[in-house]
Amino acid sequence: MPQLDSGGGGAGGGDDLGAPDELLAFQDEGEEQDDKSRDSAAGPERDLAELKSSLVNESEGAAGGAGIPGVPGAGAGARGEAEALGREHAAQRLFPDKLPEPLEDGLKAPECTSGMYKETVYSAFNLLMHYPPPSGAGQHPQPQPPLHKANQPPHGVPQLSLYEHFNSPHPTPAPADISQKQVHRPLQTPDLSGFYSLTSGSMGQLPHTVSWFTHPSLMLGSGVPGHPAAIPHPAIVPPSGKQELQPFDRNLKTQAESKAEKEAKKPTIKKPLNAFMLYMKEMRAKVIAECTLKESAAINQILGRRWHALSREEQAKYYELARKERQLHMQLYPGWSARDNYGKKKRRSREKHQESTTGGKRNAFGTYPEKAAAPAPFLPMTVL
């Protein structure tokens, strides 16, 4: 360390030696770094603004020269247009993170330019562009381009297609600096799922203008009126499925009812009468006239006692009549069996018993009453 003299001149010399060291250490260090950082940050933006202004001026000059025949500046305008395109491609390679200026051309993708949701998709993406980014550490700032161009070409002059990645049918993949962790994957909504699939397999195929501005709070709502915002669970039976099942049940019921009607229309074939039945048929009117009893059971008991009181010769006459009755019945109904009538009676009695005990309606395939269909349980949706 240099020795300072105690005199006035030595003190002045010592002050001169120590002043530059103090200024370098405490005053100029932070200011120089701030100036360098500001210059480095403002350099790319200033270059991009100069490129855009030169492109607009050259395109206007080329369009004005091409509209007037015989002007020698038309060829120079075409060459200027080619040079402008080359500089634009170079600027896109130098600054891949910058968002292009024309919002109207970029938002209307080839799939959205024709269809029934053209205007609604444009408005939905307009909202997405101006929604503030989610607060979180480590995320890049999301640029918000202006909605209107500063310099519009005059009416009637064709606009130059300066940005090819919006007009190409195959969209460019997302930039490499945006990882999959930073991209939110909300649920698909009906108004956007038809145009951009937001599944994990197709996230890499989205244009970066769409993948940057997919915010969960906006995507959960519906941009198109009349469409539900939530997707129903597959376990819930839709009303259309119930409507499809109802005609099927009606067809089954009509088939069962038609079968029952056919069986009811068939005439019931009675079995041939035996000897005692023939005697009852002949003597019943006489017993009713003689007795004051009107009950059928009492009349049958009286006829039974009289039948057993008859002799063998008298009973043989009725047995012969019964044999002739059976022969005639066999000729009229050759394939008839007494089991057919007994089966019908059993079925009818079983149906009546079921209806009286349960009071419900029988199913076409069983003897149990139909129950009301239990509604499907509602499963809550989980937001990923």
Curated annotation (Swiss-Prot):
- Localization annotation: Nucleus
Please list where the region (CTNNB1-binding) is annotated: 1-59
* Superkingdom: Eukaryota
Q: Which GO terms describe its cellular component?
A: beta-catenin-TCF complex; chromatin; nuclear body; nucleoplasm; nucleus
GO BP term, pick one: cellular response to interleukin-4
CDD domains listed in its UniProt record:
HMG-box_TCF7-like
Chain intervals with Low complexity compositional bias: 374-384
Q: Describe the protein's quaternary organization and the partners it interacts with.
A: Binds the armadillo repeat of CTNNB1 and forms a stable complex. Interacts with TLE5, TLE1, TLE2, TLE3 and TLE4. Interacts with MLLT11. Long isoform interacts (via N-terminus) with SOX13; inhibits WNT-mediated transcriptional activity. Interacts with DAZAP2.
Q: What is this protein called?
A: Transcription factor 7
Please name the source species. Answer: Homo sapiens
- The gene behind this protein is TCF7
